[in-house]
Structure formats: C-alpha cells, structure tokens
C-alpha cells in the first residue's frame, strides 16, 4: 500500500512539474533579453498609445490608432482618435484626423488601408456585452471621412483586420471574448488550444473564413496575396490561401520565439511585433492597475517572406529588442525608408529609430 501511495505521489509530482515547466515556457519565464537596437531613436509624444500603425505608401502617410489604454486599464472612460503623420515632411508631427465625430463611442484598435479606404476596429465600452464594429473611412487630400459602420455577431473579439479590396476585408478574432466555448474550453484556450476565427466581409455580408486559430492578433496580406495571421498563443504566423468564395485554406506556419502581435508588409518584408516575455507583460498590466509602472520588453523582427520555401522565410533579423525602458509593450513596427516606427500597447508615444547606422 505504501509503495502504491508513493507511486501515486510521484506521478502527481511529475505531472505538476511538467505542467509548471510548460506554463513557465508559455509565459517566457526563462527568456533572457539581450538588447539589440539602433543607436539613434527618438520619441514622439502622443495623447494615448498607438497600438497599430498603418502606412499608406502611395501617399506617404502613416495612420495611428490612438487611445489612452493605460487609462482604460485603470477603468477610466476614455475615447480615442486616428492620428496621421505626413511622412514626406520633417520634422514629423501628429495630426488628429478623426476623433469619433458622429459616433457614440470610439475606441480604435487594428487599422488597414487599401487604395482610398481606411478601416478601423472599434471596441464598445461594454466589451462582451455591446456589439463590436468596423468603421470605414474614405481618404482624401482633406483627411478622412467616416463612411459607414459594419456590425456582425461574428465579430466577437476583433483585434486586427486587413483590406484585400476597397470593399472586402478579413477580420481576426482573438480570445478575449469568445461566447462559443465553455469554461473548461476557455482554460484549454489559454493553454494554447486554437478556438479563434477569421471573418470575411465580401462587401455585403460576413462569414467565417477560417477556424481553429490560436488567438489572432495581427493580419496582413503578402504581395502574392497570401493572408498572414499572428497566432499569439502559438508563437507563430499562420499562412493562408484566399479561395474564390472568401474562405481561407491553411497552408503552413512561420515559427517565432515570441508571441506575435501586429504585422506590417512592405514588398517581400514582413515586420512583426512580438511579446518577448508574457510574464513581464502580465506584470506590466498589474502594475498599471495599481497606478505604478513596470516596463515590459519590446521586440520587432523582420522576416523576408518566400512562398516556395518550406518555412516561408528566406531571412530573419531582429530590428529592435529592448527591456522596455525606452518603449514598453511594442505592438507594431512599420518601416518608411530608413526609419522604423514603433507603436505600443500602453506607452503614450511612438518610437522612431534610424536604420542602417
């Protein structure tokens, strides 16, 4: 009997140990941050944090999703805006081009541009209760003008989106609000089981384009037309093929060391922001709730995409890696000429670094 009890105790201990090590790995507890960053960087202060940055390469402008997300974490009633930078004129200045005029609420998240159309995810004040929406805008020389609001029950927890035509787009749901799974499945979801979806809007209706993804926090399209999606909980970028009916076919994935967020695309280059340490990010959010500030590491990586390679990557390079004391919680990196623009989940600034020095 004693031997049986000992075996059972040993099994429980081993299972607990394996689970603890697995969770420590998922939370990046053992990750060591060896800083690598350009020698010349400067901050441009904002009224809130720019969680997403979308560059209009045709017109030389950057659009920023601005919201006081620190205030939001602390329970404040905040409203956001879309900012614009004229990249052709130095020094760069932030111009507010939309502050929610005509809307009851404006809390922007992911952005996308195609031609003269800009779209933004808009979160309600009561997330998980009130409907999420997509706001569409027309771009002109005068700025941007709000066109319409798109709503669908399929937009459960939208995080990012990508236009593939001026009236067609894909929207990625993360895991924050998912009413289609039970409590046990939510635990499995946190452990990495894929329950997220990508939604397709065809100009009139929305439908599910892809299922069983591990929390989609970034979406973009390559020059060949492949949809690439950040699967944050799986530390990978999923590569998907567009089908004629708007559905997406899973082809493969790009493995990453960090948990990916927003993705920018310029030619063959994919620039992906990553959470280098999930445990540090959690501590950062907890500190903000307490009115303190504890930085979280920031990571931006460049991937040269090649569709006919087995791992889809011809070259990798760390563009920016820091402990977060310069800019914390980096959520997006976008390149204009020889400059890297970095946005953050919570820091009220963007960080601009000179590349190639």
Predicted regions span which residues?
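A short helix->beta-strand "capping" segment at the edge of beta-propeller domains
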Residues: 27-49, 94-96, 144, 312-323
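Beta-strand-rich domains and repeat architectures in extracellular enzymes and scaffolds
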Residues: 42-80, 327-332, 346
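Beta-rich, blade/repeat-based domains predominating
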Residues: 47-56, 100-115, 152-168, 192-197, ...
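Short, conserved, GDST-rich strand-edge loop motifs in beta-rich repeat architectures
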Residues: 64-78, 121-129, 171-193, 273-297
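Asp-box/WD-like beta-propeller blade repeats and closely related beta-sheet repeat scaffolds
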Residues: 97-164, 172, 176-177, 183-185
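Loop/turn-rich, solvent-exposed surfaces of beta-rich toroidal or solenoidal domains
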Residues: 257-320
């Amino acid at each position: 009997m004693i031997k049986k009890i000992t075996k059972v105790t040993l099994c429980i201990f081993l299972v607990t140990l394996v689970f603890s090590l697995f969770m420590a790995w998922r939370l990046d507890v053992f990750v060591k941050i060896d800083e690598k960053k350009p020698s010349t960087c400067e901050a441009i202060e904002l009224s809130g944090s720019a969680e997403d940055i979308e560059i209009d390469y045709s017109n030389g402008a950057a659009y920023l999703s601005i919201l006081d997300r620190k205030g939001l974490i602390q329970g404040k009633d905040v409203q956001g805006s879309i900012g614009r930078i004229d990249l052709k004129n130095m020094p760069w200045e932030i111009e507010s081009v939309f502050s929610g005029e005509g809307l009851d609420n404006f809390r922007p998240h992911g952005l996308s541009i195609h031609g003269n159309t800009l779209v933004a995810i808009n979160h309600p004040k009561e997330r998980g209760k009130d409907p999420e929406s997509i706001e569409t805008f027309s771009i002109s020389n005068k700025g941007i003008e709000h066109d319409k609001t798109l709503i669908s029950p399929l937009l459960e927890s939208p995080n990012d989106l990508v236009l593939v035509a001026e009236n067609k787009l894909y929207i990625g749901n993360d895991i924050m609000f998912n009413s289609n799974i039970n409590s046990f499945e939510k635990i499995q979801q946190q452990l990495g089981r894929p329950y997220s979806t990508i939604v397709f809007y065809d100009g009139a209706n929305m439908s599910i384009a892809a299922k069983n993804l591990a929390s989609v926090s970034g979406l973009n399209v390559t020059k060949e037309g492949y949809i690439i999606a950040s699967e944050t909980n799986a530390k990978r970028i999923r590569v998907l093929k567009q089908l004629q009916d708007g559905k997406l076919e899973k082809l493969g994935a790009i493995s990453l060391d960090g948990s990916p967020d927003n993705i920018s695309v310029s030619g063959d280059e994919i620039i992906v922001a990553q959470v280098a340490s999930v445990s540090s990010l959690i501590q950062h959010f907890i500190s903000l709730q307490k009115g303190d500030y504890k930085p979280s590491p920031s990571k931006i990586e460049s991937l040269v995409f090649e569709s006919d390679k087995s791992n889809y990557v011809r070259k990798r390079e760390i563009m920016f890696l820091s402990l977060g004391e310069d800019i914390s919680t980096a959520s997006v990196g976008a390149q204009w000429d020889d400059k890297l623009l970095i946005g953050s989940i919570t820091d009220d600034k963007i960080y601009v670094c000179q590349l190639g020095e």
